Regions:
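Short beta-edge/loop segments at beta->alpha junctions of small alpha/beta modules
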Residues: 1-46
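Hydrophobic/aromatic-lined pockets within catalytic cores
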Residues: 18, 57, 119, 123
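A broadly conserved detector of short glycine/acidic/proline-rich loop/turn motifs that flank catalytic sites
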Residues: 33, 89, 118
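Exposed, interaction-prone assembly regions rather than primary DNA-binding/catalytic cores
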Residues: 58-111
């Protein structure tokens, strides 16, 4: 069958070292985009939490892991790169509000990543620099989470 032939070809190129097989059913070129891979390992998922907050200058602690939000919680090591996923309820995907898409990469805005972090940590989190965050955008996103505790924690953290 064509599927069997394709599998044999893929296995041949993996053994030869021309392509990588980081996870079952996922094949990449040797030089792959780590952000794109993060969004492909578990689907649907989007980059968020510490990864986005670090890139946005909201937290300063160095962590090389790519952190994402998905339908399950897992940590995966691929070629020494850690990919960490935190589970969030599907209804909190908010129809993509605060999630940007570029090619095959889905990434939360800093405001969305902030709210995801506060929501998942029940407010037990620390932020080094809140200036990059747009409080108006946060206020618009908060009601979509349907969480009074998120609202309270956010108001306390942002002093609003």
């Amino acid at each position: 069958s064509d599927g069997g032939r394709l599998t044999k070809m893929l296995n041949y190129y993996v053994k030869k070292g021309d392509i990588l097989n980081p996870r079952r059913g996922i094949y990449t070129k040797r030089s792959f985009n780590a952000e794109e891979l993060a969004c492909s390992i578990f689907h649907p998922s989007y980059l968020s939490l510490e990864y986005v907050l670090k890139k946005s200058g909201v937290i300063f602690q160095y962590d090389s892991a790519l952190t994402s939000v998905s339908y399950l919680s897992r940590t995966v090591d691929i070629s020494g790169q850690m990919y960490s996923y935190r589970q969030i309820k599907p209804e909190l995907w908010l129809g993509g509000e605060g999630i940007m898409q570029k090619d095959n990469i889905y990434i939360a805005s800093a405001e969305r990543a902030f709210l995801d972090m506060v929501y998942l940590s029940a407010g037990n989190c620390y932020f080094d620099n809140l200036r990059p965050l747009d409080k108006r955008k946060i206020k618009v996103l908060i009601p979509s989470y349907h969480s009074k505790s998120l609202e309270q924690h956010t108001k306390k953290i942002l002093n609003i």
